[in-house]
Curated annotation (Swiss-Prot):
CC cofactor: Mg(2+)
Native source species: Acinetobacter baumannii (strain ACICU)
Domain of life: Bacteria
Family the entry assigns: Belongs to the CobS family.
Membrane topology, as annotated: Multi-pass membrane protein
Keyword set includes Transmembrane: yes
Record-level GO cellular component terms: plasma membrane
Protein name per Swiss-Prot or TrEMBL: Adenosylcobinamide-GDP ribazoletransferase
Enzyme class: transferase
Length: 247
């Protein structure tokens, strides 16, 4: 179960103490448990909506969204900001783009990207709660945590070192494809809404993958984080929009 605890420690701020430093093989296997960590995150969010169901929807949405960011430590938002800064500041140059991604400071474009994504997510969570569709909150983080598997399975990793290299080199491919396929079927519980949402989600990932390859020749940890945030936002957005047009 070491890979599960590695995944839980990496993807959340939960106080998990590992007895030893994870090996490259353990890091690679840990990615298989990312969707399970997403289930834990989504389950907590849904549980909060059930416990505080009597609160005004706007306040409850703020609580849920703040809790979501807190549970993940803003990990993927950091990747989104770094990617946005690098894409604008890199001026189309691969080496400059990769160099900017390594800069720990956050520029104005990075801040703007976080603000836009957070505003959209907050508004969409509010609509889910108001329309009694909070159950979908469980599904969102699960789908978001399958993004790394999809990208690492299909896209070159451009850096020679780092966690991403371990994940790429030691990811169990067959098991990862099976888990990914199962996770992608989950939104079908919501029938046409879920189908439209998952198709839009996959289209967004295909597009982002194309953009990443065109600019830097593949992916980095930051671009994977950005893809998670953008993919989740697209997933909720299309689910909410289809709810009003199909129900």
């Amino acid at each position: 179960m070491a890979p599960f605890w590695i995944a839980l420690q990496f993807l959340t701020i939960l106080p998990i103490e590992l007895k030893t430093i994870p090996t490259a093989q353990q890091n690679g296997r840990a990615i298989l448990f990312y969707p399970l960590v997403g289930l834990i995150i989504g389950g907590i969010l849904f549980l909060v909506t059930c416990i505080f169901v009597k609160l005004p929807a706007l306040l409850l949405a703020a609580i849920v969204f703040a809790l979501w960011i807190w549970l993940t430590g803003g990990l993927h938002l950091d990747g989104l900001a770094d990617t946005a800064d690098a894409w604008v500041g890199g001026f189309g140059d691969k080496l400059r783009t990769l160099q900017i991604m390594k800069d720990p400071s956050c520029g104005p474009i990075g801040v703007l990207s976080i603000v836009i994504v957070c505003l959209l997510k907050f508004a969409l969570i509010y609509v889910l709660i108001e329309q009694h569709q909070s159950l979908f909150l469980i599904c969102i983080p699960i789908l978001g945590r399958v993004v790394p598997s999809i990208l690492f399975l299909t896209t070159p990793y451009v850096r020679e070192k780092g966690l991403g290299r371990s994940l790429t080199d030691h990811l169990p491919k067959t098991a990862s494809w099976i888990i990914t396929g199962f996770v992608l079927l989950l939104p079908l519980y919501w029938e046409w809404q879920g189908l439209i949402a998952i198709i839009s989600f996959l289209i967004s990932l295909v597009y982002l993958r194309h953009v990443f390859i065109k600019r830097i020749g593949g992916i980095t940890g930051d671009t994977v984080g950005a893809a998670i945030e953008i993919g989740e936002t697209v997933l909720i957005f299309t689910f909410v929009v289809s709810y009003f047009y199909l129900v």
